[in-house]
């Protein structure tokens, strides 16, 4: 019998392939996205130093209401505001192997509207 492909394993393989070509520096850190069934998480990461510079997620108190897409918009706004407050204006967008659609796109658009360039 044919086995069903594991979508998360395929996504992780895609993410590893992209991460080989993409990394964040202190000048232009990486905006990383992780999407679970219940939430969405965003981090601005300096890969050279191995440090998270700013982060936001649906676990924050400001993000508790609304649909998942509305929550993604608020997370994008929060991570952009926190990054700009630390003097970060340009980032490299790492969509984490997810399609640029839905919650990932909503978060990216909100981050752009609030001052991040990518």
Curated annotation (Swiss-Prot):
Molecular-function annotations in GO: 5S rRNA binding; structural constituent of ribosome
Example GO biological process: translation
Keywords assigned: Ribonucleoprotein, Ribosomal protein, RNA-binding, rRNA-binding
Cellular component, GO annotation: cytosolic large ribosomal subunit
Ranges where the record places region Disordered: 1-24
Biased composition (Basic residues): 10-20
Keyword field contains RNA-binding: yes
Matching PANTHER family: 39S RIBOSOMAL PROTEIN L18, MITOCHONDRIAL (PTHR12899), LARGE RIBOSOMAL SUBUNIT PROTEIN UL18M (PTHR12899:SF3)
Complexes and interactors: Part of the 50S ribosomal subunit; part of the 5S rRNA/L5/L18/L25 subcomplex. Contacts the 5S and 23S rRNAs.
Family under the similarity heading: Belongs to the universal ribosomal protein uL18 family.
Functional note: This is one of the proteins that bind and probably mediate the attachment of the 5S RNA into the large ribosomal subunit, where it forms part of the central protuberance.
Descriptive protein name: Large ribosomal subunit protein uL18
């Amino acid at each position: 019998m044919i086995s069903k492909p594991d979508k998360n394993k395929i996504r992780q393989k895609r993410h590893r392939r992209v991460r080989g070509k993409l990394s964040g520096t202190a000048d232009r850190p990486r905006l990383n996205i992780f999407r679970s069934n219940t939430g969405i998480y965003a981090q601005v990461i300096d890969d050279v130093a191995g440090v998270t510079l700013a982060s936001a997620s649906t676990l924050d108190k400001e993000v508790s209401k609304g649909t998942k897409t509305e929550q993604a918009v608020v997370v994008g706004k929060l991570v952009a505001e926190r990054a700009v407050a630390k003097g970060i204006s340009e980032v490299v967008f790492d969509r984490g192997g997810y399609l640029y659609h839905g919650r990932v796109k909503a978060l990216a658009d909100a981050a752009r509207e609030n001052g991040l360039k990518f």
